[in-house]
Every structure is written in C-alpha cells, then in structure tokens.
Amino acid sequence: MEAVIKVISSACKTYCGKTSPSKKEIGAMLSLLQKEGLLMSPSDLYSPGSWDPITAALSQRAMVLGKSGELKTWGLVLGALKAAREEQVTSEQAKFWLGLGGGRVSPPGPECIEKPATERRIDKGEEVGETTVQRDAKMAPEETATPKTVGTSCYHCGTAIGCNCATASAPPPPYVGSGLYPSLAGVGEQQGQGGDTPRGAEQPRAEPGHAGLAPGPALTDWARIREELASTGPPVVAMPVVIKTEGPAWTPLEPKLITRLADTVRTKGLRSPITMAEVEALMSSPLLPHDVTNLMRVILGPAPYALWMDAWGVQLQTVIAAATRDPRHPANGQGRGERTNLDRLKGLADGMVGNPQGQAALLRPGELVAITASALQAFREVARLAEPAGPWADITQGPSESFVDFANRLIKAVEGSDLPPSARAPVIIDCFRQKSQPDIQQLIRAAPSTLTTPGEIIKYVLDRQKIAPLTDQGIAAAMSSAIQPLVMAVVNRERDGQTGSGGRARRLCYTCGSPGHYQAQCPKKRKSGNSRERCQLCDGMGHNAKQCRRRDSNQGQRPGRGLSSGPWPVSEQPAVSLAMTMEHKDRPLVRVILTNTGSHPVKQRSVYITALLDSGADITIISEEDWPTDWPVVDTANPQIHGIGGGIPMRKSRDMIELGVINRDGSLERPLLLFPAVAMVRGSILGRDCLQGLGLRLTNLVGRATVLTVALHLAIPLKWKPDHTPVWIDQWPLPEGKLVALTQLVEKELQLGHIEPSLSCWNTPVFVIRKASGSYRLLHDLRAVNAKLVPFGAVQQGAPVLSALPRGWPLMVLDLKDCFFSIPLAEQDREAFAFTLPSVNNQAPARRFQWKVLPQGMTCSPTICQLVVGQVLEPLRLKHPSLRMLHYMDDLLLAASSHDGLEAAGEEVINTLERAGFTISPDKIQREPGVQYLGYKLGSTYVAPVGLVAEPRIATLWDVQKLVGSLQWLRPALGIPPRLMGPFYEQLRGSDPNEAREWNLDMKMAWREIVQLSTTAALERWDPALPLEGAVVRCEQGAIGVLGQGLSTHPRPCLWLFSTQPTKAFTAWLEVLTLLITKLRASAVRTFGKEVDILLLPACFREDLPLPEGILLALRGFAGKIRSSDTPSIFDIARPLHVSLKVRVTDHPVPGPTVFTDASSSTHKGVVVWREGPRWEIKEIADLGASVQQLEARAVAMALLLWPTTPTNVVTDSAFVAKMLLKMGQEGVPSTAAAFILEDALSQRSAMAAVLHVRSHSEVPGFFTEGNDVADSQATFQAYPLREAKDLHTTLHIGPRALSKACNISMQQAREVVQTCPHCNSAPALEAGVNPRGLGPLQIWQTDFTLEPRMAPRSWLAVTVDTASSAIVVTQHGRVTSVAAQHHWATAIAVLGRPKAIKTDNGSCFTSKSTREWLARWGIAHTTGIPGNSQGQAMVERANRLLKDKIRVLAEGDGFMKRIPASKQGELLAKAMYALNHFERGENTKTPVQKHWRPTVLTEGPPVKIRIETGEWEKGWNVLVWGRGYAAVKNRDTDKVIWVPSRKVKPDITQKDEVTKKDEASPLFAGSSDWIPWGDEQEGLQEEAASNKQEGPGEDTLAANES
C-alpha cells in the first residue's frame, strides 16, 4: 500500500503541480475504496476499467452523505492517471508507426512512473526526439532486447510477437485506440507470450469465429441472480465480464455494483442522475449480449424491458448499416472476417444462443463495444419513456420558494425533457427571466450580457441576494465609513483647528453652539433683563442653565423615580440605516450633562460634554477624552465596537450614569439612566439606546427607523406544503367596543415594531378577548395557515429533570419577556400572517398589517423559539462547560458551583440575551432561597412540586383526563404508586369528553394519600461525589423503580420510574421487571449522564442463581455492582410484593387426573368432563353475556380448581386458552377478562398444571379424541331447538329452509325466526301486544313535521292524524323545535280532544326533555318508531302527501303557481283542513269528523286461537278487527286487546259463538267484506259482511293498516 501511495503521489505532483493531494489524503481514499469493495488490491487502481465505477460510487457517496473529500482527491488522482496514460499511448503508437515495436499499453504502475527508460534509436540511425523519449520514460516500463506486445499482432503476417515485418514501411492499422480505453482490435485473438491474464491461469484464446478453443472465463450466473432477487431483494451476485487493459482476458468485476444498481433503480427511479451514472459506469467496458440482456431483466420491469429490447434492436440496426457501408468498421473486425449481423450482435448466431462462453469466444472486440454502446443508448431512451418528466413550461417560482429550489426543479425538468442538449441552456435562461419572482426578474434583466450560462445566472442572483438590508455586515461597514468622516470632521474642527495661543482647546459657545468664541463674546447673546427666569441647574433667578457658571455645587438632578434605562436592546451591529437627512432644525452636535450616580467619591460628580446626535449607532459611546479619569470602568464580554471606524477597543462604565440633553433654552430633557461605553474615539456619540428614551427620533431617507429586537440572521424560514396557495378568510365583524380595543392593540404592536403594513394576498381573522383584569388581548386565528405549514419536529423531547442539578449549587431563574415577540419572522414568510383591521360600516378602507415577529398560535412558533434561544446560548455553553444551564421554552435556570460564579455567569447570560434582542424581566429574576421553576420549588438539597389543590372538581371525562395528566407530571417527583393511580385510570374509560363522572370514594381516598405524600415526599438533588444507585420492586398493580443515593441506608430518591400499562393479555412479572430495569438504566444515562453504579434487585433473584435470561439481557453491558437484598424502606408507600419465579404451567403431561374442557357460543355453556371408571363426569357453567373465549377460560379455570393440590392435565381444543396458559407459567399481570379468570385460578393452586391442546373433530382414534368429543357434545347440547335456531340465524343469517334442516324444526317455525330478524326482513313484523293504530278515536295519534316550500318563510307544517278516525290537524311553523311541537299538540287537543298516546319518529323535537315533561303534564303516553323507517309512521306520511296535494290544488286554483303569499297562507291552510275533514274520502260514507265524534261500537267476532312464542296455539280469544296482515283480538277472560300477525290466528272450531254486529263494520277493516278468512261455519257472518259492503262501508287509503 505504501509503495502505491508513493507512486500515485509522485504522479500527482508531476501532473497536478501545487494542487496535488497529500499522501494522507491518497491513503484515506484507497482505504475507503478497499472498504467499499471497489478495489480488490491497490494495484487495480492502474486499470482504466475500474475508474468509472470508482467515480460513480464516490459521486453517489458525496450526494447522499455530503462527504466530498474523497471525491476531490480521486478527481486529482484520476487526472494524473489519465495524463500518464495518454503519454504512454502516444509513445506506443509512435513506436509502432516507426517500426520500433510497441502496441502494448501498460498501466501507470510503479515501474512505469519511477524507472527511467533508455533512449531507443531507429535502425537507420534516426533518433527519436529527446523530449518525447524522456517523457515517455516516466510511464513506460523497461524494455528488453525484444519488445513484447500484447493484443497487437503484425499487420502484414499476423504474427503476434517477433516477426520481421515490424519495421516494414506499411500504413498503420485503422482505428488505433487513443483514449481512456485502449484499442480492442486484438481482443479475441490468440495471446502472445507477453499476455497476462489476471486472477487465473493463462489459457489460449480461440480465433474469431472458432468457439472450440474458448477458455471459459468467469461469467455471470444470471439464473442465480434472478432467483435471489426474487426471493431476498438485491443480492451480492456475480457481475458481467469486461476486457482488461493488460490483454484480451475476461475477468469479473466487483459484485457489489449490480446490487447497488438494482437498489438505486428501485429507490431513485430510472431518470435519476445517480442511476444514469451507475449504469454508465457499469457499461463503460464491453459486455456480452447474454450479460446485457440479463442485466436489463434485473433492473427493469416487464414493460420497460420490452421497450428496451425494441430500442436496442433499432440501435443495433444502425450499427449494422454503418458496418455495411464501411468494411473496415470495428464491428467487422477491421475487414479480417465475416461482416457482422443482427444475430451476432444479439448473441443468437450459431454457438452463441444461451452460451455465454461461446459469445465470449466468437464475438469481436468491435462488436462488443457496439453491443454495449447500443444497449446504453437504448436504456437512456427507455428511461425517458418509462418515467416522463414534468413539463418544464409549467414550472414557476413560488411566492415563498427560494431561487435555488426553483432552479433545481427547472433544470431537472429541462434535462429530463426531449429537448436537444444544445437547446437546454437557452431554455433554462429564458425560464429564469420569465418564470422567476418579479424581484429576481429585475436582477436578471440588470445582469451583464456576458452571462450566457445557467450557472453564471444562478451565481449572479445568489451574489445579489446576499445584500440584505438593516442588519447585514455590509450596512455596518457602510455606516462605519459614513460615520467616521463625520465624527473626525466635527472633532477636528472643534479641537484641532480652534486652539488658542496657549495651546488649550477652546470650548464651543454655550449660546449658539458655534466654535471660535465664548458665550460672553457671542453676538447672539441674550440680554439678561428678565428677573423672572429661573436656572434649571442652580435654581437661581435672573439667568438660565446656559448662562449658569456654577459647575460643581449643584449641577443637574439626582436620580429619582421616573428615570428609566434605554428601552432598546443593542445588537453587535447597527440595525437601522444611517440617518443623513435631518427632519428638524437641530444641529448634529448637542450639549449633554453626565452625572455619576455611584456611591464612591469622585472629583466631579457631573460633567458637560458635546456629543454627536443622530449618528445611527446602536450604543452610546463616550470618548475617553470626555470621560473623567476617576470614574471607574470595567471590561466587557465583547471588548470591541464594530462599525465605528472598523474595530475599536471599548470598556463599560461600572456605575450607572444619568444622561440629560440640554435644550436651546437651557432646559434639561428628561434624564435617562444607562451604562455607556467608553472608547478611544475622537468625539462622543449618542446611540439608539438613549435617543428613544430622550424623545428623539432617528430619521433616514426611507422613513421612520425600524428596530427588530433580534437580528434577521437568526430568523428560521418556515417549511410549507407543496400546495401552499394563499389563504384568504374574511375578517369577522366586530362590535364597536371590541373594534376600538383591537385598534388600540394594533397601534401598540405597530409602535413596538411587531407588525408592519401589508399588501399580502393572505388574510386570516383577528379578534380580542377580555382578560380577568379588564384589559383586552389580541388573538389571531391561524388555523388555516397552520394547515399549509409543515410542522417542525420536536427539538426538546421533554422537560429537564431538576433533581439532576448538583446538590448545594446555588440557583438563578430567568424569564424571557415576550419571547415570541422578540424573534423575527423570516421575511419571505411574513405575508402569510397578514390580517385586516376593519372599519365600521366600511367608512374607510381597511388597514392591513402582517407580523414581523413570531405570532402566537402558529404551530412552529414554540419550536423556533427554542431553536433561536438555544442558538444564542450555545456560545456560553461552550465557554462555560461546568455551568448548568437549563432551557425550556422561555424559562432559564442557571446553576454554578459558587455564588460568585453564578452571579458572573448570570450577568453574562443576561447581557448575551439582551444583546441578541431579548428582554429579561427584572422582577422575575429569582435567586435562592425559594426558587420555582417549571412548577417545582427548588432548595439547596431538594426538589418539590407545588400547586396541589385540596380536592379537584370532577364532573366529566375531560376533567378526569386533565387530573390524570397532572398526576402523571408529578409521579416522577412524588413516587405515586400504581395502586393510587388505579381509581383514576378506571374513570378514563369512555370516548365522550362530556360523559358524566363522579368523585367516588376510591378516588377520594387515593387523593388524600397523594396530597399527604406531596407534603412529605420530595426529590433529593444529586450529589456527584456519591455513587448513583437504582432499585426495582414489584408492587400492587404494577412495578416501581427509583434512582437515588444511599437507598439501602438513608434513602435519597432522585427520580421515580414506573412500569407501563400492559399491552398484552398477560405479562409475566419477570418481563415487567426486565423492562423496568432497562428503562432505569436508560434514564440514568439520559438524566445524569452516567450509568448506575449500584443496582438493587429483589431478594428472589439471590435465591435463583444464575439470573433469569430476561434479567441478564436487561443487564447486558452493565459494569456496576449488583446486589440482591430485601426491599428498601423507600418502597413502603407502594406496598411491595414478593416475586415468585416458580413455574406453574407446563406443556408436558404430568402424573395426575386428565380433564377435558370445551365451550359453545350457541349454548353459552362451558363444560368440564373427566372419566371416573366406566362413566364420564360432567360439570357445566352457563353465561348468556359471556363471549366464547371467556367461556373457554372459565371452563379451564373450573378444571384447574377441581384438584388444587394435585397435578392436573387440562386438555382443550381452544388454541387461544392453551397459548395463554403457557404464557402464564409464572406470575404476572393480566389485562383482559380471560387472563384475569385464569390468573385467579392459577393463584389458588399449589401443584403443577399441564395444558394440552388437541384439534377438535379430528378422526384420530384414542383417549384424547374421545374425551374431546364428549366435552364438545355436552357443550353443544341444546334442549330448546327454537332458541338454537335463533342463535344460529343471528350468527349466520341463513334462510328458513337451511335453518329447518339444521335445527330440526318445522318450516313455519323457521320462517318465523327469519321474519323476526331486523336484517333479513325488509318489513319487520311488530310484536304481539303492540297496537299499531287505535281501535277508537283519541287512542293513538301520529305526528310528523313536513316541509312545504310553497308556505315559505314558515314552510314547516306539523301534521297530526287520529289513527282511528283519520281526522287531521295542521299548524304552520318557521322551524322544527320542541316549542313548535308542543304548540301544535295544544292546538290539536283543542280541536280533537286529548289522546291517550302519540306516536312520532325519534327527532330531537319529540324526544327532548321539555317535550317529555309537557307530555307528562298532559298524561299522554309517547312512543317512537324505528329510526329512519317511515313504515312506523305510515298513516301520517300518507296524510302529509294528501295534505300537500290538497294545498297544491287549492294554490293553483287561486293563481299561485309557486310560492303562496304570506297573507294568504293561513286561509289556504284552513281550507285544506276543511276539505279533508268534513267531506268523504274515496268510497267512505262517513267523513273523518263523523267517525271521530260518532264512532262505531265494535263487537266481538268469532272465537280464534293465537300462536304464542313457544309455538303452541292458545285459546280464549275473539277477533275484533281483521286488517291487512294483522288482526286485533280480545281475551275473553281479561278483556285484553292486542294486535297479532294474521298468520298467527286461526279459528277455534270448538267454540260456536255467534257474531253480532251493530250499525256497521269497524272502519279498521281492510276494505273488503270477506274479512274472515276461514270456514263455511261462518256463512252468516260472510253474508252480513256482504250486505255491509253493498251499503258502502269501504275505507280510504289513509285508514289502511300500517303493514
């Protein structure tokens, strides 16, 4: 390896110069290639056949992993190898043409780079050029006296080596190879003496056209490739063969290439650049037709493969046409054999079909090259056809899309189109100019005309986009260059150019501010004649502050209330544009008074200075010349000021300085407190940190200065879904009071710089809510915008564990004020968060704004807040690795080993956050004692939760859910055991959040223990000097673990852990503890950054050695100490339990009785049978509500409890129960009903039990089959076949004929069973005893609401019909409500009377609480029909239709074709009711009113028998009414009247009662006189019925029966 590295390094230095890679980089590259299997040995690097695969693999690695170092090194090495090879090829060709031998192209190996070659001369004495010989000597090996050639024979005689024709003056052979790969003219011919065959013994090759001497190279086993791909995906397979440069030897390439290619095609697709690169690399060397076709079968589907075969044939026809025109074409073997044809190129000629060895021997090198090139071109065409790219003409840059992403999509689409390569670049540039965003289009139009390629355009746009406004470094540099001349000119004019004769600098005039004279000499000096003028400095009369000469006695005011520090945080660079244009008449120089508020003595408490105003600087800087020497200064975290003349060292005032600006009239502006910077500048400068507080304003050419609290480079762009079209939701109307509050809040946010005016095409509504304090809060409904966003992943998986803070370390808690409003929103995303401020009655155009900071309610705001704050704090974490800094959203907790270190770190954190633009609430800075953070109170040694109430209020399921969530938050700190959480978990069952819940006794008792635990329990802070211990134990309803210190002696818990809720039917305690130990170890590493030092296991593991396999797996890699001891006292609250490792169940028979169990869902029985002597003993258990699995489990449990102290064999045909019993071999936690049943039975046994599973209904003879059959027959025995038939039909819904045969019942009984099924009978029969209609007036009403559009706006009609008389009452309503239903019934009662019962559908207006109460007050029974089934309301539905037809006819008769006027609706509705109630309908001789007020008295008909549920016929009934499919019968003894289906009624011939009838037959008759369907013995009744029919007693359709 070292020799190869040395050779390659020498070649790189020769051909690459200064850019050559180092030996270390070359070695790393070679190691990677060998590791990836791309090189079998380092010497293979000299083979050109391996270059393209290496390039493809390293390119893919660079694209996927982003690691391009090895690719860069390989590019330099490849260039050197190619250059060396080109020189050697040229040299060998020159030797051949000059008759000096040659023809061999050797790889650039060590011998061809380092060994010089002797000069060779031509026999005639002509010398080859010295330069060529010397350069050729670098790469050519030393030649012997007789040069050897490989693969190149004599042109005249064909002799391979040593012929006398070598120096003949003949023309060189055509098609001499001179490129990346050598000439293939001699491939396939017999090797010479110098031929080398790598990886195998040398064997002679066959002559072209003769397959008999083919040596049989290493070829591709494509059958195995396809078999493995079909079974296991992409395998490691043999590869096709290529031609080595050493000669015509066929050797296999690296097998991983075909695996990588198949995987790439499957994942990336055919059009992927990675796929194309790998295919081109694989086919860079000639391939056999056998290998080409099989390769395409592997990577292409059936359809693409068919396309490829056609395309390949077309390409091969092109090659044949070219070979036909040119006899010396390489495919024809340069004229030394038969011409090529399609069969040869496809491998279908004689000796080639299915014979890769024959193809390798018979095909010429030129044919192989043509075959491979044609296959590659065909693959490119298939890729375009199989996976067409999207139309590039439809691609447009999105509003929030970056130019790079747009360029990626456009270039990919253009390159995948059918455009010719020469037209792609102009098309891409034209799309850049037309399809990009308007600002990008302007940049491109302004670009120089010399930019002619897409790459140049992209680079130009990206370079121009780097120029960002406000906070970019370019603005800082521009301000620096602009401020410095201004400062220097002013200071030079003031100081250097205005010195007196004595050399002292003269001050400015106090009156006019101009230099060159004193105040006393000022021509603008006021006349001091105003005795009422008072001095603001000395409080004297007769002069003002500018005329006052007292300097040290009483100058200025002391700091007092009302003074404030600068409101604007300061960034490291200016955040506003330079203000060069002044909007006021003030001069740029102002007079300032500085007062030191410190307590230490100084010579001068106050000084006057001149400062530069409106400079655009971020901070106030006092020149060291103006700063008193005895005023103390301190060093700062950032020791330099950037933007003021480049970089200037600075310090900061230790004391707070009071700064005031003196106005022209001598008055003093409101003083301001700040800590100014002190630097070596030639003039003091007032920055933004004090100008705003002084009431001054920065101005610029654009307008009002804009201040963002955090630099824009910290803004994180949002990710939008592909279809993020703008969302526009109109602003909701707001009352005037809320609109005023909204306007005030918007103005406030605008002044704070949180929003800006907008013209966005997005809009979502805003509103205000009143807070408890009475003020309003602004809210923005961003749900529609959030639906377009791609949510960010969680960057913080949970809250930090506070007990991990080192014990005794002092703490400090900081709170970031308005954290969201301190973080800017990316500029390209702001337009999506626009809103509208409306005006009342649209009196003025609406004002529109958009957020510049993170809006509250945006789904990504919390994540961005965490990321930005974490990015600001990251330098401090690196600078202070020992500082514990806990960051969760906008809360920070700092912990240091000392108070001084904590204070220093806290000040540095505060300064860093303030410089970044965040605001720290001073009143929320907490220091010990009594620090609270994330709902916990922290002391120097403990962490305790706060906020538990005495007793929560529980009313709904949602209340329980919130309470359980709070308890889950507290469990790691309090160690609440599972037994106390059980009562609350029980109340979580349900799906309706509003489902009622009660605060029951179990919950109350558990809550009392939790509250008591919260007053005594707390976590202890971790002591790094003591070992970290962990312990686990089983307890009631689960397991519990703890991380702490001194657990066995003086317990100090640091974190509690609990087992999860079981997810399987049964979980063994051993598995529960195993999972808890794994969880405990992971929590220790995650929380404390270290593994547990000591692990305490239950004492049962000490008795059971070696440890169980599950425990050993949980302890894998554990290097600490393991101790098995009794349960520590810290677990007493959890009530620990002993863990038994005893095996209770086995799958092998045990000596003891054998019992058989079975259960049946049809009989709802479970049975246990066992043999005692010649007879079988049976025990049964029945439960109609249990499932078959539960019945099986109960049967097995009953069998286990037959002999609790005796080993028992339980045989069952239930695989479910058998598998569960085997899993319950050891004690564990059940979670299903069946598991609880079995666990209860096993816990009562003391002997071993064996569970044996047999297949039911098997024909295998023997004891087990016999016993299982007995149990099965007993379980399925049915004493009541009719019940069995019902159960069978309920399960399978089979027809009556199959049901009759299966259950051995009559056909009539089977039909009845089917008809009672609501799923199989489309018109289900009503049960006997339910009266579908009244036998007389006012017995049963039917009511319904129907919609009549003609009656709009009160288009709902409430309709009630009396089921006996057919009388109708209708009322009109606007909506369907309970009040409307009650009003309608009151009207109907007033017209018809009070009914006994009313039948309706199950609409909410009829089933509401108020309607039920109304009906109860009136004493009316109420029933509902089948939901969604109109047949239960047949009479009222027909009445609805009849009423609507009558309304339509009456309306059209009055000329109202569509809508009826409201004034006419009441009259028309009354006319319709009159026509329906007071006139006969159909063939009836009585009107509904007559039937209602003069009803017919029903008489009893002939005696009948009815069939009851048992199938028997019951006597004692007389028929009253015979309807359509139903009959009303009356019991002669009890006078009970019921309706029964007509098929269940037959005459009772034992009774000869006469049928009497009064005036007329019942109106309930079905319209026919022969309503009695039986017997001649009732001829008198039939004659009477016939006479009634002649009198016209028929009924209308409304009176028909419901059936």
Swiss-Prot record:
Region named Disordered: 128-150, 181-215, 544-571, 1549-1603
Binding annotation for Mg(2+) 2: D1158, E1192, D1213, D1272
UniProt-listed Pfam families: Gag_p24, IN_DBD_C, Integrase_Zn, Retro_M, rve, RVP, RVT_1, RVT_thumb
GO BP term, pick one: DNA recombination
Motif (LYPX(n)L motif): 180-184
Site annotation Involved in capsid protein dimerization upon acidification: residues: D418, D430
SUPFAM superfamilies xrefs: Acid proteases (SSF50630), DNA-binding domain of retroviral integrase (SSF50122), DNA/RNA polymerases (SSF56672), N-terminal Zn binding domain of HIV integrase (SSF46919), Retroviral matrix proteins (SSF47836), Retrovirus capsid dimerization domain-like (SSF47353), Retrovirus capsid protein, N-terminal core domain (SSF47943), Retrovirus zinc finger-like domains (SSF57756)
EC number: 3.4.23.-, 2.7.7.49, 2.7.7.7, 3.1.26.4
Short sequence motif named Nuclear export signal, residue ranges: 219-229
Region (Involved in homooctamerization): 1548-1567
Keyword Metal-binding appears in the UniProt entry: yes
Domain RNase H type-1: 1149-1280
Keyword match Transport: no
Annotated Peptidase A2 domain residues: 609-690
CDD domains: HIV_retropepsin_like, RT_Rtv
Residues with site note (Cleavage): 155-156, 166-167, 177-178, 239-240, 476-477, 479-480, 488-489, 577-578, 708-709, 1280-1281, 1567-1568
GO cellular component: virion component
Zinc finger (CCHC-type): 507-524, 533-550
Keywords: DNA integration, DNA recombination, DNA-binding, Endonuclease, Hydrolase, Magnesium, Metal-binding, Multifunctional enzyme, Nuclease, Nucleotidyltransferase, RNA-directed DNA polymerase, Transferase, Viral genome integration, Virion, Virus entry into host cell, Zinc, Zinc-finger
Binding residues for Zn(2+): H1289, H1293, C1317, C1320
PTM comment, free text: Capsid protein p27: The cleavage at the C-terminus is slowly trimmed by the viral protease, sometimes being cut internally thereby generating the short version of the capsid protein and a capsid protein C-terminally extended by 3 amino acids in a ratio of 2:1.
PANTHER family, sorted: ENDOGENOUS RETROVIRUS GROUP K MEMBER POL PROTEIN, RNA-DIRECTED DNA POLYMERASE-RELATED
Role: Capsid protein p27: Self-associates to form the irregular polyhedron core composed of hexamers and pentamers, that encapsulates the genomic RNA-nucleocapsid complex. Assembles as a tube in vitro. Binds to inositol hexakisphosphate (IP6), which allows the assembly of the polyhedral capsid.
UniProt-recorded name of the protein: Gag-Pol polyprotein
Source species of the chain: Rous sarcoma virus subgroup B (strain Schmidt-Ruppin)
Gene: gag-pol
